Amino acid sequence: MYTGRFAPSPTGLLHIGSLLTAAASYADARSNGGKWLVRMEDLDPPREMPGAANHILHTLEAFGFEWDGEVAYQSRRYALYEETLCRLQTAGLVYPCHCSRKDWQTGARRGADGFVYNGRCRNPQQRPAPQGKQPAWRIRVPDRVIGFSDGIVGGYAQNLAGDIGDFVLLRADGYWAYQLAVVADDAEQGVTHIVRGQDLLVSTPRQIYLQQCLDVPTPQYAHLPLLTNAQGQKWSKQTLAPALDLNRREQLLRQVFRYLNLPEAPEADRPAELLDWAVAHWDMDKVPKHAITTP
């Protein structure tokens, strides 16, 4: 059975880009007779906004979204992540890293998603002394191409060794890294389809590699076009994207429907009616492949 999900981070309030992702993932799930889960990705407390998680859920309800089951909170799922890391440790796929960021980024080259880790701590003889600090844990990546067929973008591939390097699963400050948590959650929740923004396209080969290491299914992926401002920057909390105005719910839903190349939506009394209409008219093949500049 199709199981999709929407996984916001409570580092701020929902904005127009969030609404596009929620609407597209919801329409794809419901049009396929599937479930739509909501998962709160609250892995990084220092960056989170007090009250944002509750505000996000209230906003989704106000826009007519209905999710299946209880909301999952990553902050309550640490035991799952510990079990997942233990499996990788037992398999000899991960190692402790005592490098500071300055240690390994000095002289490092840029790859697909920041600097490529130089592998200094792969060899136990070359690891810096712990100096009483907890290590990060990294996973060894293969020198081979990992690719997949995306439902919107088409073919996408990376050589993890050359483009990314061994990446962190547990940070030295004790917080779980996104890549491990999202793979563990998707597997445990039975997620079969992931519809999300193209900013996460670069993360997908890492997640597929983790899925292979853990022998769990790889979902089908579809990465949505990003909404950008006049300067070409992705609308986000960092670029001061305004929070969704609950007094303009129908107007904002019609706006994201246009971005997704849906037909012109009819008048409706409630946002839920507009979402039902979007489900009935959903066509992934018509979703644009490239970024969309918005006012």
Curated annotation (Swiss-Prot):
Cofactor annotation: Zn(2+)
Single GO biological process annotation from the record: tRNA modification
GO terms for MF: ATP binding; glutamate-tRNA ligase activity; zinc ion binding
Residues given in the record as L-glutamate binding sites: R5, F6, A7, P8, S9, E41, Y178, R196
Enzyme Commission number(s) from the entry: 6.1.1.-
Broad class of enzyme this protein falls into: ligase
Renumbered ranges of motif 'HIGH' region: 8-18
Motif stretch ('KMSKS' region): 234-238
InterPro entries, per database record: Glu-Q_tRNA(Asp)_Synthase, Glu/Gln-tRNA-synth, Glu/Gln-tRNA-synth_Ib_cat-dom, GluQ/Sye, Rossmann-like_a/b/a_fold
Binding residues annotated for ATP, in chain numbering: K237
Cellular component annotations (GO), alphabetically ordered: cytosol
Domain of life the protein comes from: Bacteria
Similarity-based family: Belongs to the class-I aminoacyl-tRNA synthetase family. GluQ subfamily.
Listed HAMAP family: Glu_Q_tRNA_synth
Protein name per its UniProtKB record: Glutamyl-Q tRNA(Asp) synthetase
Record organism: Neisseria meningitidis serogroup A / serotype 4A (strain DSM 15465 / Z2491)
